[in-house]
């Protein structure tokens, strides 16, 4: 009797990602998985757990905490790491934070550079990681669309889009010199819809902010910003209104816009994704604070 070994498209994506994760574990001395607490990170963490099951994942998680994340994100992070036995490293730029750096006072560009990019680079140098997994996907944004799965970084952690290595089929070049590193994107070929379908298939826990509910938001420059704590400037507080919203992407709460939605279950989110025509990155303020914003940030060492 002939067996049918044809995989569904989700299982094909899963197999590719697991292969990439295992390849990194085999090729590099000290890898780390960057954990943003979002839906893509949650899928990536599940794939890592499956890649080495029933053994322990041979690398830690590292979260770059800007001190402006949604409170529900931090609660979810701590609970998930504890329940699943992950070695969780949390890095923050406390010098900048104690100096009062924030998105409202310094703007998105300065805040992102000091609280996210510089904190990330410090963490990578501190622990001497030579490979860092990220949850970026090519369908998210144009600069990410042209980046390799194994993305080379020089000894300053900088990315040069004109100096990328060829990737033929599933052959990856892990050769680096001392001080250089590789950013690895095992979800490169996934779409936002794939992510949600896989979350449904695997019953992966995610931050409740992804589900629609009544939340206090204020319209700031066309973005529905949730009033997550008392650091919202006084000038915006009298404009707060309750709307049924959810988040398609998560980051620092003053820089992440919500979308009006009734999708309060995974099934409804999947249905919503079937008809959407805009990337989730359109709600991220940091992607539009300068021309070619994301590419420039990546050149400087951003995720």
Curated annotation (Swiss-Prot):
Pathway: Sulfur metabolism; hydrogen sulfide biosynthesis; sulfite from sulfate: step 1/3. InterPro entries: PAPS_reduct_dom, Rossmann-like_a/b/a_fold, SO4_adenylTrfase_ssu, Sulfate_adenylyltrnsfr_sub2. Keywords: ATP-binding, Nucleotide-binding, Nucleotidyltransferase, Transferase. Belongs to the PAPS reductase family. CysD subfamily. With CysN forms the ATP sulfurylase (ATPS) that catalyzes the adenylation of sulfate producing adenosine 5'-phosphosulfate (APS) and diphosphate, the first enzymatic step in sulfur assimilation pathway. APS synthesis involves the formation of a high-energy phosphoric-sulfuric acid anhydride bond driven by GTP hydrolysis by CysN coupled to ATP hydrolysis by CysD. Heterodimer composed of CysD, the smaller subunit, and CysN. This is Sulfate adenylyltransferase subunit 2. It comes from Phocaeicola vulgatus (strain ATCC 8482 / DSM 1447 / JCM 5826 / CCUG 4940 / NBRC 14291 / NCTC 11154) (Bacteroides vulgatus). The gene is cysD.
């Amino acid at each position: 009797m002939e067996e049918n070994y044809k995989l569904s498209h989700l299982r094909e994506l899963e197999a590719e990602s697991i292969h990439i994760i295992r390849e990194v574990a085999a090729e590099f001395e000290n890898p780390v998985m960057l954990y943003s607490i979002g839906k893509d990170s949650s899928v990536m963490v599940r794939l890592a757990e499956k890649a080495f099951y029933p053994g322990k994942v041979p690398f830690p998680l590292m979260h770059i905490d800007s001190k402006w994340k949604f409170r529900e994100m931090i609660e979810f992070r701590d609970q998930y790491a504890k329940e699943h036995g992950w070695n969780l490293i949390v890095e923050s730029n406390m010098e900048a934070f104690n100096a009062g750096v924030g998105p409202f006072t310094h703007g998105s560009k300065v805040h992102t550079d000091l609280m996210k990019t510089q904190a990330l680079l410090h963490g990578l140098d501190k622990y001497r990681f030579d490979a860092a997994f990220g949850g970026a996907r090519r369908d998210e944004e144009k600069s990410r669309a042209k980046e390799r799965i194994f993305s080379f970084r020089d000894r300053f952690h900088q990315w040069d889009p004109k100096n990328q290595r060829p990737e033929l089929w599933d052959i990856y070049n892990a050769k680096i010199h001392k001080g250089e590193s590789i950013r690895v994107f095992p979800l490169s070929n996934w779409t936002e819809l794939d992510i949600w379908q896989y979350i449904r298939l695997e019953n992966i826990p995610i931050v409740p902010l992804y589900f629609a509910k009544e939340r206090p938001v204020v319209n700031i420059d066309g973005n529905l910003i949730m009033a997550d704590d008392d650091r919202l400037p006084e000038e915006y507080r009298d404009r707060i209104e309750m709307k049924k919203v959810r988040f398609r992407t998560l980051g620092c709460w003053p820089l992440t816009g919500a979308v009006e939605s009734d999708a309060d279950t995974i099934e409804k989110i999947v249905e919503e994704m079937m008809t959407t025509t805009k990337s989730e990155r359109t709600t991220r303020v940091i992607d539009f604070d300068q021309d070619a914003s994301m590419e420039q940030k990546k050149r400087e060492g951003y995720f």
